[in-house]
């Protein structure tokens, strides 16, 4: 077997390391040599903080890539939220990870690489969100004139919330609900978006009143300080809010993307409070002025109506004047009605007398004699005619009986019987109709008799005068003074004695 000394370099002075030893030596060398460095690069592979709070990503340029990690404590101290593609300057130390022979930078501080890079990123985001319609003026909501509750999204400490509450208390005291958030740093954007969405999910009748308007406020600061309000999640939450939102981020010269998505932008948090509520004293003064104007207008209105009423009352005729013409027309109509009733009664009496003369007993007796003679002649002719008819029908029947079989006869008999039944029913119906017609005619004649009778005249307030023999008195000239008369009214007779007096003229003679 060959000796170990046969291998090249076996007896050299090169030190021998284990894998762990060489990895540890490299780690110490890197950390000692690059204990504190500043690295400029573009963020790549950023997915937000891990569940542990740490963030893992890489910094790259056009020729190399450096793995990076930010521990949870350093992550919470960042003044902006890292985003994919953002160019930053990271401050930290280099180290290696022996388990995979990789080196990385542990970032302690990080800031955007100049305002130009942030502005370029901001402009790109602005154009993209505008193309989606999130800044469309048609989506803007009107602020309520007199809100009941105002929701404020800001830091619970500092001058901003104190200025807002103080200004609201001075102008129009009402309930203010504060949703505390961080207004700077990596978690600023998500917390503001959560607050806006949380206010929108409050029910109208819940234990916490739903605000009528929201104020998202923060004091002034650099572009990096205000970067959380340029976060896309904040812009989308404000644009989707069903509650009107006032943006009051930074000073008047500062602007963020939330200003474009909000329904109203205020130059300062104090200005936002002034936009949200009116001045109570101004409202009271306006109410008093409007009330005075209304009272004055109502007073003038009632004065005008009173004057118009008095003028109308003076122009209106009295009741006697209004009724004079109708009364005259009524009297004339009553007079014409009396004459018309008298004339109509005379005409009906003449017509009735004519019919009565036609129905004299002599004429009726002659008519009855003629009818009896006719009936007697018919009675004499009927037996002979009936016997001849029966002989003829019997002969025809015998002749047909010899020619026909029983079956057709039976069918014809049944058919004839059915026809006879139908004829019977039709006869009964015709008789009923005739009886009804006669009855109606009798009723009409009865009504005519009652109409023509003088008793119907008595029902209308007239009276009939009879002499001592019970005959009606038709003319005043037929009555002598001292004659006993009977006056028949609707409900009975009254005996009277005639005496000399004026003769009432016949009203028909004046026509």
From Swiss-Prot:
It is found in: Cytoplasm. Its EC number is 3.1.11.6. This is Exodeoxyribonuclease 7 large subunit. GO terms for molecular function: exodeoxyribonuclease VII activity; nucleic acid binding. The gene is xseA. It catalyses: Exonucleolytic cleavage in either 5'- to 3'- or 3'- to 5'-direction to yield nucleoside 5'-phosphates. Bidirectionally degrades single-stranded DNA into large acid-insoluble oligonucleotides, which are then degraded further into small acid-soluble oligonucleotides. InterPro entries: Exonuc_VII_L (IPR003753), Exonuc_VII_lsu_C (IPR020579), OB-fold_nuc-bd_dom (IPR025824). It holds the Pfam family tRNA_anti_2. One of its GO terms (biological process) is DNA catabolic process. Heterooligomer composed of large and small subunits. GO terms for cellular component: cytoplasm; exodeoxyribonuclease VII complex. Keywords: Cytoplasm, Exonuclease, Hydrolase, Nuclease. Belongs to the XseA family.
